[in-house]
C-alpha cells in the first residue's frame, strides 16, 4: 500500500522529509486545511505533491507564475506524475485538449493561474470532477 514515505522515495527520490514537511503532508491527508509559510527552497511543493498522489481525485494548484507552472509540471512529468498546466501561454486548441484529457482522468495535478478560477468554463469543469485539494 502506498504511503507518504513510499511516494517520497519512489516518485521524488528522497529518503526522508525535510523539517515540517511530514506534518503538513499528514494534515492534508487527514483532510485539514493547511497554510504553510516556508522559505524558498524549503520544499513546499513536496508538501502538496505527495498527498496529491495519495488522494483519490485531482489536485488543483493555483500559481500566478507561468514559468513556475511550466517548471513544476515538467519536473512532475519527468518523475512519471500525470500533471498539466492551464494558462494563457497555451493556444485555444492546447487548452481544449488539456481539458478534454483532464475530463478523461489523465491528470492527478493541474496547475492554473488565479484568474482561471473565475472562468465559468473552468468552474463547470471543477464541479464535474472529484477535486481532492486546492
Please annotate each region the language model reported.
Residues 29-30, 54, 78, 104, ...:
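Residues at the C-terminal ends
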Residues 57-79, 88-90, 94, 113-118:
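Conserved Walker A/P-loop ATP-binding site and its immediately adjacent core
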Residues 36, 60-61, 84, 110-112, ...:
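Hydrophobic positions in the central parallel beta-sheet of the AAA+
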Residues 56-58, 79-82, 107, 130-132:
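Short glycine-/polar-rich loops that comprise or flank the Walker A/P-loop
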Residues 42-45, 49, 90-133:
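Conserved helix/coil segment N-terminal to the catalytic DExD/H
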Residues 1-39:
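Conserved pre-motif I regulatory segment
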Residues 31-50, 60-65:
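Walker A/P-loop
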Amino acid at each position: 500500500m502506498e504511503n507518504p514515505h513510499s511516494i517520497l522515495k519512489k516518485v521524488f527520490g528522497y529518503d526522508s522529509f525535510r523539517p515540517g514537511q511530514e506534518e503538513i503532508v499528514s494534515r492534508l491527508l487527514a483532510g485539514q486545511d493547511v497554510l504553510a509559510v516556508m522559505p524558498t527552497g524549503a520544499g513546499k511543493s513536496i508538501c502538496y505533491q505527495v498527498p496529491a498522489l495519495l488522494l483519490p481525485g485531482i489536485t488543483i494548484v493555483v500559481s500566478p507564475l507561468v514559468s513556475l507552472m511550466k517548471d513544476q509540471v515538467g519536473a512532475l512529468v519527468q518523475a512519471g506524475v500525470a500533471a498539466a498546466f492551464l494558462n494563457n501561454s497555451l493556444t485555444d486548441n492546447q487548452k481544449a485538449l488539456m481539458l478534454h484529457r483532464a475530463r478523461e482522468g489523465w491528470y492527478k495535478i493541474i496547475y492554473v493561474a488565479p484568474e482561471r478560477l473565475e472562468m465559468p468554463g473552468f468552474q463547470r469543469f471543477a464541479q464535474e470532477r472529484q477535486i481532492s485539494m486546492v
